[in-house]
Amino acid sequence: MSPQNNHLQRPPAAVLYADELAKLKQNDNAPCPPGWQLSLPAARAFILGDEAQNISRKVVISPSAVERMLVTLATGRGLMLVGEPGTAKSLLSELLATAISGDAGLTIQGGASTTEDQIKYGWNYALLINHGPSTEALVPAPLYQGMRDGKIVRFEEITRTPLEVQDCLLGMLSDRVMTGPELTGEASQLYAREGFNIIATANTRDRGVNEMSAALKRRFDFETVFPIMDFAQELELVASASARLLAHSGIPHKVPDAVLELLVRTFRDLRANGEKKTSMDTLTAIMSTAEAVNVAHAVGVRAWFLANRAGEPADLVECIAGTIVKDNEEDRARLRRYFEQRVATHKEAHWQAYYQARHRLP
C-alpha cells in the first residue's frame, strides 16, 4: 500500500491488495470470461488465498460456495448474498467485484431513503435548465457507470430499499439496457458492456421489511453465507483481523490469545443459546464474527491508550457489554446470568479473572 493511502481509515480491497492483484494478473494463464480482469481460478485464489503464490486468505468460506458465486457471475446472472448480519457478505461482494472488475467502488447503499436517481442517474440542474436534457447534464449513478464501463455494481442491503425502487433493476438484469426517456437518439439507450453485473446483499433479519418481487428474485441466483462453524477458524480470523486493526491504530500490542479465547467462546456460547434454545435465555443481539473483531479492537485500544499495556480479561468485560446489550435491558440481565452460570464454572486462570471482573458490567 502506497504511503498516501496509509492514512485511510479503511482502504478499499483494490488498494489494500494491489500487489496481490498485480501478481495474480501477471501469472494468470487461464481463459477469462469477457470483461473480467482475472480468470475464475485466479479470482478464487484472490479470495481464498494461495500459498504457492503467497496470496492471503481474506474470508472464511467454503471453496465450493466461492466457485458457485464466480460461475453465476460469469454466466451473467445477478448474485444475491443472503445471511445473518456480520457474516461478511459485504466483504465478500467487495472481494468478488475487485477480482472481476479491479474495482469495487460502484456501490449502492440501500435504505428507506434510497431513490431511483441514486441508482441509475440524476441531473445537473444548472446544465439541464440552460441546455436541456443531454449527456453533459446527466449525472451517472453507480448502475449507469457499471453498464457503461462494464464493471460489477454492488447493491448493499437491497431489502431495505422500497419495493418500487428495487424493481428499477428489472430491465437492466434481463435486457441489459437502460432507457433514458429524457434523451433522444442513441443517447436514450445505454447498453451494458461485457463485464457488467450486479452483486446484491440482504440480511435475513430484514426479511419482510421490503420483500423482493418474484420477478426480481428470478433474475438473481441466491447464495447463503453462513456464520463460521469451526471455533479454531473463527479464533484465527478474529486474531488476524483485530491485529491488523490495532496495527493501523498505532498500537504495538496484539490482544493476548487467552483474551481472544474468552471473547470468541463467549460469542459462540451466547450465539448457540439463540440457535439451540438451551436453558440459557435467548439474546436479541447479533453475535457475529464481525462484532467479535470490533470488540477485540476495542479491547486493544482501551488497554493501550488508557493503561499503556496489552488487553486483559477486565478490558474485555468493559468492552463486551455495549456489543451484547445494545438497547435491550433484558439482555443485560441475561449477560449477567451467563457470567454466573457459565463463566464461573471454568477453573482456568484467565476464565477466573474474567469472572472476577463481572462487577464491571454496566
Swiss-Prot record:
Identify the stretch annotated as signal peptide in this record: none
What is an example of a GO molecular function annotated in this UniProt entry?
Answer: ATP binding
What Pfam families does this protein's entry cite?
AAA_5
- Write down the superkingdom of origin: Bacteria
Q: Which protein, by its recorded name, is this?
A: Uncharacterized protein YehL
This chain's source organism reads Escherichia coli (strain K12)
Q: Provide the organism lineage as a comma list.
A: Bacteria, Pseudomonadati, Pseudomonadota, Gammaproteobacteria, Enterobacterales
